[in-house]
C-alpha cells in the first residue's frame, strides 16, 4: 500500500502584511509552517491583481522556505522562466487555461527545477486532471479550490470535498491541496476527505495565536491519516 502523503500547512501570504513580507514569512516558518503559499494573479484569469516574480525574488533573499506558487493567470507558460529565476519552489497552473499545452508546461516547469502542480476551479470536473496525474511526465500536486479563486476571506465550499475524495481514492500518495475558507471550523471535513496540503490565510493571520492554528490544522490532517 502506498504511503500517505505528509501533512503540509501552507499559510497564504495574500493574507499577510505585505509591507513586512519577509518578517511575516519568517514568523510563519518559526510557527511551524511547511510551505508559504504565494498567489500570483494577473487581473485577467481572476479579477484581482497581486504579485509577480519580482516579489518572489525579493522574498527568496530572506527565506529558504518552500515557496508554493499558485498561478491564477491566463498564460502560465509566460511565468515559468521568470519564477524559476526568482526562486519559486512549486508552480501550480490552472487546467482551465492549459487544456491544450499541459504536457509542454509540465516539462518546462520540471526542466527549470520547480515542482509542477495543477489546480481546478469549483466548476471544473475533477476528471479533467486525471490525465495530468497519470501522464508519463505527471504533475506532483493537485490543488482543489474550495472557493472561487481571486480573493481571500471567502466561505468554504464543502461540496468540493467530493473532488478530494475522488482524487485520494485513485491516488493514495498524491499531494492533494485545498485552498479557500480553511480554518479550525472546516479543516476536519477537508482532512477526512483526504487533503494533506492545507492553504489557510485569514484563519492563520487573523488569529491571536497563529501557531496554534497551524498546529491544529496539522493535527487534523495527521489524525485523519491515522484513522484511514
UniProtKB/Swiss-Prot annotation:
Homodimer. Belongs to the ribulose-phosphate 3-epimerase family. It comes from Oryza sativa subsp. japonica. One of its GO terms (biological process) is pentose-phosphate shunt, non-oxidative branch. Binds 1 divalent metal cation per subunit. Active with Co(2+), Fe(2+), Mn(2+) and Zn(2+). Pfam families: Ribul_P_3_epim (PF00834). This is Ribulose-phosphate 3-epimerase, cytoplasmic isoform. It catalyses: D-ribulose 5-phosphate = D-xylulose 5-phosphate. The lineage of its organism: Eukaryota, Viridiplantae, Streptophyta, Embryophyta, Tracheophyta. It is found in: Cytoplasm. Pathway: Carbohydrate degradation; pentose phosphate pathway; D-xylulose 5-phosphate from D-ribulose 5-phosphate (non-oxidative stage): step 1/1. Its main location: cytoplasm. Substrate binds at residues 12, 70, 150-153, 179-181, 201-202. Its cofactor is Co(2+); Fe(2+); Mn(2+); Zn(2+). The keyword Iron applies. SUPFAM superfamilies: Ribulose-phoshate binding barrel.
Amino acid at each position: 500500500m502506498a504511503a500517505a502523503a505528509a501533512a503540509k500547512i501552507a499559510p497564504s501570504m495574500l493574507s499577510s502584511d505585505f509591507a513586512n513580507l519577509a518578517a511575516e514569512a519568517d514568523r510563519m516558518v518559526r510557527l511551524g509552517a511547511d510551505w508559504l503559499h504565494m498567489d500570483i494573479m494577473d487581473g485577467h484569469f481572476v479579477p484581482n491583481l497581486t504579485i509577480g516574480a519580482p516579489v518572489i525574488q525579493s522574498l527568496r533573499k530572506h527565506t529558504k522556505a518552500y515557496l508554493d506558487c499558485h498561478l491564477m493567470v491566463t498564460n502560465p507558460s509566460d511565468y515559468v522562466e521568470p519564477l524559476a529565476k526568482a526562486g519559486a519552489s512549486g508552480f501550480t497552473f490552472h487546467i482551465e487555461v492549459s487544456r491544450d499545452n499541459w504536457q509542454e508546461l509540465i516539462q518546462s516547469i520540471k526542466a527549470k527545477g520547480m515542482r509542477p502542480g495543477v489546480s481546478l476551479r469549483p466548476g471544473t470536473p475533477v476528471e479533467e486532471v486525471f490525465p495530468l496525474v497519470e501522464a508519463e511526465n505527471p504533475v506532483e500536486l493537485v490543488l482543489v479550490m474550495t472557493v472561487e479563486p481571486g480573493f481571500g476571506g471567502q466561505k468554504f465550499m464543502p461540496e468540493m470535498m467530493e473532488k478530494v475524495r475522488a482524487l485520494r481514492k485513485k491516488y493514495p500518495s498524491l499531494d492533494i491541496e485545498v485552498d479557500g475558507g480553511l480554518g479550525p471550523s472546516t479543516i476536519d471535513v477537508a482532512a477526512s476527505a483526504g487533503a494533506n496540503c492545507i492553504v489557510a490565510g485569514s484563519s492563520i493571520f487573523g488569529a491571536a495565536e497563529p501557531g496554534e492554528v497551524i498546529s491544529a490544522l496539522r493535527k487534523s490532517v495527521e489524525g485523519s491519516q491515522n484513522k484511514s
